[in-house]
């Protein structure tokens, strides 16, 4: 964010990575904006809106990736929250697992159906796209942009089409460049500090505390109770393997925000000169992988 930009011209963009305390911050951020100022999109689908539609809103909050938010034709103030990658992955598993069977059947949620029917080991070993893309370095992929983790590597997507592959180094590089361009970033344990920094810029109501919402302890009519499954050596190994790059990005980000008092304001990142790898022999296009599951 440029220090010369009038805050009234800024769009607040909350890039909400699932199971990082984002429901809490969304609740408090949204109280500052009228419905007319608020983009209704809560998932990764900003590309379905026209530039004119995006221009009318000042608050964006959803499970976005770092590429699609660049379509917003305003000066941006970008906020995100990270979490220990293994904790986040387990939290996401139990969140999906807890959904009642009736709700899953009624809404046809494939990822929830698969999760509900199996074990944690089944979840971590699944190659179904609805599961695999969310278990393999998910935070890094979202922070890198419109990227999907596949069994053959990391696919870079543009306008719903695959345009190339990313190496591990390229994926991490894109994620870190984007993180360094964000205005406020922190850990799930720092929600109050994160809110305070955003509130100062946008003139929001100060809060004495920021209580967590949507936690596993919360009772909900659509949720079952759950019993944690034992973490066997095999599961532990899979958790480490599937979050390897997430852990690297998380630790590097932690070092940076602790050094800079959680404030990252180093100018806008620019990945437009980035050239992905061309299609490689032996690697299936994403469309073929999905088709093998009848998707």
Task: Locate each region found by the language model.
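Hydrophobic positions within alpha-helical membrane elements
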Residues: 26, 89, 216-219, 251
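A residue-level signal for conserved active-site and pocket-lining positions in enzyme catalytic cores
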Residues: 21, 84, 186, 198-199, ...
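PAPS-dependent sulfotransferase catalytic domain
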Residues: 46-80, 87-210
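The conserved 3'-phosphoadenosine-5'-phosphosulfate
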Residues: 40-41, 167-237, 265, 269-279
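Short, motif-level signal for alpha-helix interfacial/capping segments enriched in acidic residues
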Residues: 1-2, 57-69, 221-228, 271
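A non-catalytic, amphipathic alpha-helix used as a structural packing/dimerization or gating element
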Residues: 193, 234, 238-252, 256
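Long, low-complexity C-terminal extensions of enzymes
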Residues: 249, 253-295
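PAPS-dependent sulfotransferase catalytic core
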Residues: 1-64, 85, 91-92, 97-109, ...
């Amino acid at each position: 964010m440029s220090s010369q930009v009038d805050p009234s011209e800024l769009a607040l963009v909350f890039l909400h990575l699932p199971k990082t305390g984002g429901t809490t911050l969304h609740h408090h951020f949204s109280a500052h904006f009228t419905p007319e100022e608020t983009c209704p999109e809560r998932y990764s689908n900003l590309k379905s809106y026209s530039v004119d539609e995006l221009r009318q809103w000042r608050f964006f909050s959803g499970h976005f990736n770092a590429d699609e938010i660049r379509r917003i034709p305003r000066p941006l103030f970008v906020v995100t929250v990270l979490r220990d990658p293994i904790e986040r992955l387990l939290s996401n598993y139990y969140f999906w697992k807890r959904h009642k069977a009736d709700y899953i059947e009624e809404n046809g949620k494939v990822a929830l159906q698969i999760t509900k029917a199996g074990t944690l080991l089944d979840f971590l070993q699944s190659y179904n796209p609805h599961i695999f893309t969310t278990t393999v370095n998910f935070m890094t992929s979202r922070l890198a942009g419109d990227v999907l983790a596949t069994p053959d590597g990391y696919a870079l997507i543009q306008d719903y089409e695959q345009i190339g592959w990313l190496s591990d180094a390229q994926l991490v590089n894109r994620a870190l460049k984007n993180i360094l361009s964000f205005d406020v970033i922190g850990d799930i344990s720092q929600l109050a500090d994160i809110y305070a920094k955003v509130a100062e810029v946008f003139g929001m109501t100060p809060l004495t505390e920021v209580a967590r919402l949507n936690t596993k302890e919360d009772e909900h009519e659509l949720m079952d109770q759950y019993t944690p499954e034992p973490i066997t050596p095999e599961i532990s190994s899979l958790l480490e393997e599937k979050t390897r790059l997430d852990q690297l990005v998380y630790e590097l980000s932690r070092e940076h925000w602790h050094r800079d008092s959680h404030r990252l304001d180093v100018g806008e990142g620019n990945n437009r000169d980035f050239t992905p790898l061309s299609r490689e022999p032996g690697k299936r296009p994403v469309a073929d992988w999905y088709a093998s599951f009848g998707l």
